[in-house]
Amino acid sequence: MASPTKAVIVPGNGGGDVATHGWYGWVRKGLEQIPGFQCLAKNMPDPITARESIWLPFMETELHCDEKTIIIGHSSGAIAAMRYAETHQVYALILVSAYTSDLGDENERASGYFSRPWQWEKIKANCPHIIQFGSTDDPFLPWKEQQEVADRLDAKLYKFTDRGHFQNTEFHELIRVVKSMLTPAL
């Protein structure tokens, strides 16, 4: 598989300008400094419910996620990234605050992502690099679900105890992980 040429940040639901919300804009600026590498952080359609039927086509036709793309998905964006990788080849998934169920939440249920079983083997077959960031003190996601994602996808897991739902304004570890994918092994 060819080396990645871009990263795409797929945000969590909730709205707000992706360029200025949390760490999204900070990471985009950091990755844009890499010569020959592009990072997209666009506002998603249907930002509150984040419906699968709207987000996955947008990821394909507007964000052009393909085998040279690193998809960085946060929260609902991580869920969209996993569903996307069930049917599309991508270079890598970086999942931040990923989970496996609708958590009993009506809005999550309405998104459509949780209406069927996960196709873990297809995700792994379509994506050779899967990295996950999770925190045991996430106020929205039980650790059990985050750990299940890591186990099912054989993800390289960066486990924290103090990051909550990763809503900070900087994310140095994520930048390092992307850079490590772009550096040929010596």
UniProtKB/Swiss-Prot annotation:
User: Can you name this protein?
Assistant: Serine hydrolase RBBP9
User: Enzyme group, top EC level?
Assistant: hydrolase
Keywords (alphabetical) are: Hydrolase
Membrane spanning residue stretches: none
Biological process according to GO: positive regulation of gene expression; regulation of cell population proliferation; response to nematode; type II pneumocyte differentiation
Family per similarity comment: Belongs to the RBBP9 family.
Catalyzed reaction equations: valacyclovir + H2O = acyclovir + L-valine + H(+)
Does this UniProt record's set of keywords contain Transmembrane?
no
Q: Which residues does UniProt mark as catalytic? A: 75, 138, 165
* Gene Ontology terms for molecular function: serine hydrolase activity
Q: What does this protein do?
A: Serine hydrolase. Catalyzes the hydrolytic activation of amino acid ester of the antiviral prodrug valacyclovir to its corresponding active drug, acyclovir. May negatively regulate basal or autocrine TGF-beta signaling by suppressing SMAD2-SMAD3 phosphorylation. May play a role in the transformation process due to its capacity to confer resistance to the growth-inhibitory effects of TGF-beta through interaction with RB1 and the subsequent displacement of E2F1.
Tagged with keyword Nuclease: no
Quote the subunit structure annotation.
Interacts with RB1; the interaction disrupts RB1 binding to E2F1. Interacts with RBL1 and RBL2.
Tell me which tissues or organs this protein is expressed in: Highly expressed in the spleen, testis and kidney. Also found in the heart, liver, lung and brain.
Coiled-coil segments on the chain, per record: none
Superkingdom assignment: Eukaryota
Its EC number is: 3.1.-.-
Q: Where is this region: Involved in binding to RB1?
A: 63-67
InterPro entries associated with the record: AB_hydrolase_fold (IPR029058), Hydrolase_RBBP9/YdeN (IPR010662), RBBP9 (IPR052581)
